[in-house]
Amino acid sequence: MRSLLPLLAAFSLAYAADAPAPLAPTKADVPYAGTSDFRQTLNVYGPAAKPAKPAPVIFWIHGGGWRGGEKTTVQLKPKFFTDLGYVFVSTNHRYITTTPMNEIFADIAKSLRWTHDHAAEFGGDPNRIVIMGHSSGAQLAAYLAIDERPLKAEGLSLSMFKGCVPVDADTFDVPAVIELATANRKAAGKPEPKYGHREIFGGKPELWTDYSATTHVAAGKGIPPFLILYDAAAALTPDQAKRLERALTTKGIQAKAFGAANTTHGKINSDLGLPNDPSTTEVLSFLKTVLAK
């Protein structure tokens, strides 16, 4: 076994040397809420070449169960999107352990306010934003693209969005996921978690409903087109993706739920930007359509 260690070490070094270096932000740790709280900062990645005309902006919200995650955990996405000529913004938000859900919504709205006001400095178009996120960040992205109230508090409107791409979230319809998760746990003989969706979303049924993106879907208020990505083999996210798709399409809003095969909750996110990745192909097709309008 010892004789293999030098070979394994050499392989690891070679692999690390071949792996692309993460793209450095054009501007890092930008405060967006007038505070010194690191959780209320964002990173901006500008396109390598100055665009001939204002570029679309990809606004990304990290996952982490609303109580973890970091704006730097973006894998391939900054390089992938800036190579396409887009501006890429990745935001932090305060955690649910210190901040209620409605104030997390407000954090994202403030971050969008900063992005809208400063996008042009990086070659971006403040009125051509596509909001995206993974897991809990996907729930936040969908909510901000559907319920206009957090944006309105910042003097913004849904018209700033050209599209929304939530990636593998299970909380677009909070009462429904609580019901399904409870049934799954009972069937498996598992206890309820001490700090689950009930607690994260305010502990009251009326808040579970209000914090659900599906509750606020309505025609005629400017909700952008949606591409809803999910792991086709997951326990909860397929049902939630289809619920959101159905809520949108029944109101005449463009939406497509795409279930990726042979993936996981983490992989569907980290693979975004890889050649021949099915979810990436869907994203590129979606962007081509919505940004042409």
Outline where the language-model segments fall.
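Bacterial N-terminal signal peptides
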Residues: S3-A14
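Alpha/beta-hydrolase superfamily serine-hydrolase fold, recognizing
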Residues: A17-K293
